[in-house]
Amino acid sequence: MLNLKELCHELSISLATGQNWLRLGKISPTGIEEGQPYFSAEDAEEIRRALADAKGGRLQSRRNKSHVSGLEIYTSYLGDNAVNQEVLPHLYECFTEEFLQRNCLGILRHYAKSLLQQAGLPESLAVFPGQSTESLSESERWPSVFLVQGQDFLGYLYLSLQSRGIRKANGAYYTPTRIVHQLIESLDVDWDIRILDPCCGTGNFLLALRDKPCDADRIYGQERDPVAAAIARINLALAFQISDPVFLQKHIREGDSLTDWYGKSWDLILGNPPWGLSFTEKKKRMLKRNFDMASGKRVDSAAVFLEQSLYHTEEGGRIAFVLPEALLQVASHRKLRERMLEQAVIERADFVGNPFSGVFCPSVLLTLRKGKKSDAYAGIFVEMGGICWRIRDGRKITADNFYLTMTDEEYDWYKKIEALPEACYLKGQADFAIGIVTGDNRKWLQTQEEEGHEPILRGTDISAFRIQAPSAFIRFCPEEYQQIAATEFYRAPEKLVYRFVCNRLQVACDRERRLTLNSCNIVIPRIPGLKMEYIMAVLNSEVLQFYWKKRFASAKILRHHLEALPIPPAAAGEQEAIIALISADREQLEKRIRKLYRLPEENSPF
């Protein structure tokens, strides 16, 4: 068996890259012992083959998805090889998309009745708002569904029968079953408590509570989508064998938790608040009046939900939410982090990568306890990519220093890099320029060089130290593009170009005065005494890969990221030696750069 560090050595990748692949679900361990992942020789060989086969040497996430225009089957919602998984593909095959969307309620009612009948509950509980627009006389062609305790089949059905546009507008990213159970199982609480899911969707979190010593009398949910609320009531009935419709109406209420909170205070508030919700101007004005987290230019629904939940949690009570990682990292959410640290203690953070089908949004399962630290508080428990650790209580966590993805050891290395004396910075000592935004790439870009056209660099053309032969060509008409920097930046005799969307710094030097597209941005360093190629070598180094990933944890490389990276000063001779190693010996190059940062060789995380 191989541990993660040994696997990374076998694959010739850095430990930080391996940890990132684990976090994003691109590799899976054979098992976990004492909180550490391990890999069999067979699994390691499979990963090696996948890496060799992957385009551009990048390991791709494996996703088993079926698409129809406007509709998408959420196979990941129920889990791999789940019972009832094949119902949706069968419906897609037998009926048109128009029929399925128009008769969504009738289809839901049909399957709800079947599940209720199997559970020995009255079919009259299958109450949905509105009526199907036509008779569903072809039900004999519909596949059977089987009652599986704890499975949100109706939510899976409803989610897959909505168009992607509607789901996005509603912020409806229903939580996959495995993530629901991971959050529930992570909670160390006395289950004889009052529980609320304020945005319960179809009730998948409430369904998962059936496996806990938790009475249905103590479980409540609220949901603004009337169809989802109806499904949540049916799910609650199935989970707890409830036949009383009045009870179900009371415990699953239709309503908007941002404007009409259910109840006054709760012992546990849990769930997955909507992300990226679209608000009307009238609603935005109302939210800005009532919530501190809505005071900025953009109102983030997840941030406002968290503020609302903090207010309505009992002292000593808990909040357990699925949230975008950005809330913990992005500067615009600094005020929210301040509020969390003022009013609550962070107990746990599970970083789960990208759990939502078709959506790139790294996510975290965050558990807060309202109130001050107790004497028994042992620090924040963190899990990421199958690796677990606890952040020591003495480590300072602030709104600006909210680095939960670092172990204490990694944090110590990070601080060593940050503490470099006499470090140089690109801020105020470099020109930055974005690549050209054409407004219509299909109109402007050609795959063949024609008369009057010239090469243009794209992000995919850039890797560390290297620019591959451009595969796109453009006619240079600066006055006709949607957005363009000053021509002098593109035509500079020497400039650094970098990939804008990337999970690591990828910087190369262009001396051919080439144009760049907006996926490939420009920086022209002007740090006195430092050569451009030397700066390129430092930016591509494993030291700064580690520092950038741990500090910003972003899928995009932004200007302020580059401006904040500490660059070690070096004598002219040392710079020349490092530049020579770019093509001669990358391993020695890394050692020389590490030495400039005054970092020890032993126990390095990169």
Cite the ranges covered by each PLM segment.
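Conserved SAM-binding strand-loop segment of SAM-dependent methyltransferases
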Residues: P245-G255
